[in-house]
Amino acid sequence: MPDSAALATDPAAFRDAAGDATAPTRAVVEARLPVTDPFAAYRRARGDAPSFHYETTGGSDGWGYFGVDPASMLRADGAGALDTVQAAVGARLARVGCDVPHPGGLFGWLSYDIARELEAIPDTTTDARGLPRLQLGVYPTIAAWREPFTPGDDLRLIAAVPVDEYTPDGAFEAGRDRVQSLAAAIRDGDPAVGPPPADSPAPFESVAGRAAFESRVRRIQDAIRDGDTFQANVSHRLDAPAAVHPVAVFEALRDTNPAPYSGIVEFPGVDLVSASPELLLARRGRELTTEPIAGTRPRGATPAEDDAARAALRADDKERAEHAMLVDLERNDLGKVSEYGSVAVPDYRRVDAYSEVLHLVSEVTGRLRDSCSLRDAIAAVFPGGTITGAPKPRTMALIDTVEATRRGPYTGSLAAIGFDGDATLSITIRTLVRRAATYHLRVGAGIVHDSTPAAEYDETLAKARALVTALGDAGGIGRVADTTPDNS
């Protein structure tokens, strides 16, 4: 590895951009550093500060990011969480030739419970874990890279410098120093996270249990028959006490379950390890995209079995009806903030393959109205309709009556939000939450009139399998206990 990163930003172009600033502005200094593996670079650089690493695995095109030393942390415990986000973005960003979608910004997670400030949802669940509604780090300095990544490719080391705090020359020097400091941390840092725990770990156990989950399914089906909802996503939580470091779990998960929205967030009091397949919202300028997933089949053991499962998924009347309903819901959500006539479905009902399951996926797009902000766009689609149901407000109220505990980060978002307001937010499904040496894994299923309760419970365990296996590979117990409690 070189002793320092090679500067890619032209100093004269940077000074011109900084000197032309007429409003609070950040300007980008970029350097390049070839590495073997971005995650290995993250492990060396992370240290003890709040940090994150996002990547697109499995061969998908995209961008990866990591940050290891935030300028500050944002946390919201009550109403106004999305206002906190909006207040932190909107700067005029001078990219100075940088093509990275989010060259610095806010990275972290949003809780499903932000929905309580967007809709009138009765607060009938408990919150024993005491998690905030939002936890984001403000990262002016990050590393980014193109996916898929080939060993020897460049990391883009980026500093988004607030130029109004410096002279143009001083701003460039500050950015140069920041990217070289990150390069030094990558070169000299210690990647160790400690040995696997010596104590005997325990398997995952469902907090609810099979019988209670199946009872939840039947209660939702009663509500469907009464006309209160058409479809609802019902979940339960699996818990496993384990001292395994989340970095080790994420490293195992990268191999067992590559996903387009994978990441680890190591923040005060809570760690997230995510392998989400689902995009909640992407904003690029005024262009908006969401990609709802609705419809699941287990992978086959052979290519022929996979092909048969794909065909069965596409042909299944229940899955087709559920998918169509949720695509319509997402079209309606984007329509709340999009220019009239701009909402479209350019990709409908494709089948995407993951390590354990196949999914039906569609793409819905729109163009954000000039009068609407990033906060408005997030509020329009949050939380995702595929993990609530339709109609969304009434269904979220029903979910609250059947689920005993708050969801927290589950079905919220893992967020990358640029200082300019461009953003990428996944839905935090297939996500482990670690708090106080216990891993929590919440999994759910979409319930419709003709769902089979036992089959829906089995589907939730299929969705959990890759993450349960990853914890086992890292030193925990890679299974769900056969005997689980029955807590309605």
Curated annotation (Swiss-Prot):
It is an enzyme of class 4 (lyase). It catalyses: chorismate + L-glutamine = anthranilate + pyruvate + L-glutamate + H(+). Chorismate binds at G295, T296, Y410, R430, G444, A445, G446. Mg(2+) binds at E322, E459. L-tryptophan binds at P260, Y261, S262. This is Anthranilate synthase component 1 2. Coiled coil: none annotated. Its EC number is 4.1.3.27. One of its GO terms (molecular function) is anthranilate synthase activity. Belongs to the anthranilate synthase component I family. Pathway: Amino-acid biosynthesis; L-tryptophan biosynthesis; L-tryptophan from chorismate: step 1/5. Keywords: Amino-acid biosynthesis, Aromatic amino acid biosynthesis, Lyase, Magnesium, Metal-binding, Tryptophan biosynthesis. Tetramer of two components I and two components II. Binds 1 Mg(2+) ion per subunit. The gene is trpE2. Its cofactor is Mg(2+). It comes from Halobacterium salinarum (strain ATCC 700922 / JCM 11081 / NRC-1). It comes from the Archaea. Component I catalyzes the formation of anthranilate using ammonia rather than glutamine, whereas component II provides glutamine amidotransferase activity. One of its GO terms (biological process) is L-tryptophan biosynthetic process. The keyword Magnesium applies. NCBIfam families: PabB-clade2.
